[in-house]
């Protein structure tokens, strides 16, 4: 009886360890470092294409069920924070000469949305997602700071082997900037909404 009890305990321990080990292969946490290509536009004005941009993202995937067929899981992605910075160079040509100046634009946001993860082989993970990204967007232009709430959406996919991988993401949204510190009247904001549309490529670390 004693030997049977020890055998059952051993089998249970091995089963639990195997389940934990298998679950660990489904990486939940992610840290992304990316570069951005984006366009900022307003009705009636020329589109502005970025000079360069960068991003930093931290989040986690919450899986909704055990693996289907051992290879497929659906989940909810929660990005705790996503920081994006974009630099624009503007050349203003007039009769009297050419002026060069810059816009600095950025967002701080959180994301939430559905995702799908496929693990066809042991360490290979393919992850696809679409997220709603409420943001605070800021713009420094003409020696003035502007900012406001912005609505963004992001969608993309990544492929990783073990801890490290590569990803691609499209992002789009709009914002009506207002001068920070002003009384919020119409003269202190841009006349039209500013639209942002672009993509990012990123290096991802999953744990």
Regions found by a protein language model. Name each.
Residues 1-27:
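Cleavable N-terminal export/targeting peptides
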Residues 20-65, 196-207:
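Short glycine/proline- and aromatic-enriched beta-strand/turn motifs that initiate or cap beta-hairpins
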Residues 20-28, 62-72, 119-126, 160, ...:
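Short loop/turn motifs that connect adjacent beta-strands in outer-membrane beta-barrel proteins
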Residues 24, 31, 40, 146-207:
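Predominantly the C-terminal beta-signal and adjacent terminal strand-loop region
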Residues 29-35, 72-78, 112, 128-130, ...:
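Membrane-embedded beta-strand positions of outer-membrane beta-barrel proteins
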Residues 38-48, 80-105, 137-148, 176-195:
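Flexible, solvent-exposed loop segments that connect beta-strands
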Residues 51-57, 105-111, 149-154, 196-200:
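Transmembrane beta-barrel architecture of outer-membrane proteins
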Residues 79-81, 107-117, 121, 125-137, ...:
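Detector for outer-membrane/organellar transmembrane beta-barrel domains
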